[in-house]
Regions:
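Single conserved hydrophobic/aromatic residue that forms the stacking wall/gate
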Residues: 1-7, 11-12
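Short, conserved charged micro-motifs
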Residues: 13-15, 187
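Helical element adjacent to the flavin cofactor pocket in flavoenzyme catalytic cores
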Residues: 16-20, 49-107
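A short alpha-helix-loop-beta-strand transition element characteristic
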Residues: 21-35, 266-268
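General small-molecule cofactor/ligand-binding pocket signal
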Residues: 30-34, 39, 78-80, 211-213
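Conserved active-site and cofactor/substrate-binding residues in soluble primary-metabolism enzymes
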Residues: 33, 59, 63, 80-83, ...
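C-terminal catalytic lobe of FAD-dependent flavoproteins
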Residues: 55, 180, 184-187, 191-302
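Active-site substrate-recognition segment that forms the wall
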Residues: 85-87, 92-95, 102-233
Length: 304
């Protein structure tokens, strides 16, 4: 995994972090890369320092999701698709969950809607803010180009507040994530929306076709820590993974399962790390977020 850093402040901070991880935790899989050697990591432009973490991994998220679903069903659980929950009514020692097709009585409810929570469960809604993020995939690149932009076949990201992240697929497509929106609407053309972010790093790909573009909604918290907890002893929830959901949502699921089954000190520890609520309530949360995100986007453009 390679993180490429933009701006002098970020370089200083991450040099210190590399030193801290190596000294305090004896973690020798991470190293810093100064500017003259960055071309060994990628042909991307506009970067001043890099961090390489040889102890990290990247994976295929869809295959991982399908694998988790298979494991759940193998263990005896049932999965019901197209069963959107419309209401959760908490009683003294159970909850009544309503869908379009059924009403279910449950002793415990696990709520992990993240950016898709909407108005389903107001008690926890103000702890998160939904935002949209977008990804494109190029046409298959020739071997020389692929080796030039990502010779280590690593997963890469930069240090901008509105982060860009990318990797190569098995058939040498560049899969590039970049750009955010803060309304409930997606861009008319995701490929047109993301292309400038890609070309800012790899101008050499200006003539490369973008074959696919897609997006989704995630949830952030104010301090970027996941928000875990239990409401009235019945509804366990995990949300606000802030772009790190692939590893941390799995961790949260394990903690919640253990907590429901037999109690879990680690769940109690995580749920004790309270996240601050977004100000403004249901009506003003989003405008305040847009103002803040535009400010930090401007800092990105100014190289701060």
């Amino acid at each position: 995994i390679v993180m490429r850093l933009v701006g002098s402040e970020m370089c200083i901070r991450d040099r210190d972090e590399v030193d801290h991880l190596r000294a305090a935790y004896n973690y020798d899989q991470i190293s810093g890369v100064e500017s003259p050697s960055l071309e060994e990591l990628t042909s991307g432009v506009g970067f001043h320092y890099g961090v390489v973490d040889h102890g990290a991994r990247h994976l295929h998220p869809l295959k991982y999701c399908l694998g988790l679903a298979k494991a759940v069903m193998t263990a005896g659980a049932s999965v019901f698709e197209k069963s959107r929950v419309k209401d959760i009514d908490i009683k003294r020692d159970h909850a009544v969950v309503s869908t379009d097709n059924a009403i279910i009585k449950a002793q415990k409810v696990v709520l992990v809607c993240n950016g898709y929570l909407g108005k389903l469960f107001p008690p926890i809604a103000s702890s998160i803010m939904p935002i949209n993020n977008f990804i494109v995939a190029t046409e298959p690149l020739d071997e020389a180009t692929a080796n030039r932009i990502n010779p280590l076949n690593a997963s890469l990201s930069d240090s901008l507040f509105v982060i860009n992240y990318w990797k190569l697929s098995e058939d040498r497509r560049l899969i590039f994530g970049g750009g955010e929106t803060y309304s409930d609407k997606f861009p008319e053309s995701i490929t047109d929306f993301v292309r400038p972010k890609l070309l800012a790093i790899y101008p050499e790909l200006s003539n490369v076709r973008l074959d696919y573009g897609w997006g989704g909604t995630l949830a952030i918290t104010r301090n970027r820590m996941p928000d875990l907890g239990v409401h009235k002893g019945v509804v366990y929830y995990a949300q606000g993974f802030s772009g790190h959901g692939v590893p941390t949502a799995t961790m949260a699921g394990k903690l919640i399962a253990t907590a429901i089954d037999a109690g879990c000190d680690d769940f109690d520890l995580m749920s004790g790390l309270k996240t601050l609520k977004f100000p403004g309530g249901p009506l003003l949360r989003r405008p305040s977020l847009v103002a803040g995100m535009l400010f930090y986007s401007l800092r990105d453009r100014l190289g701060r």
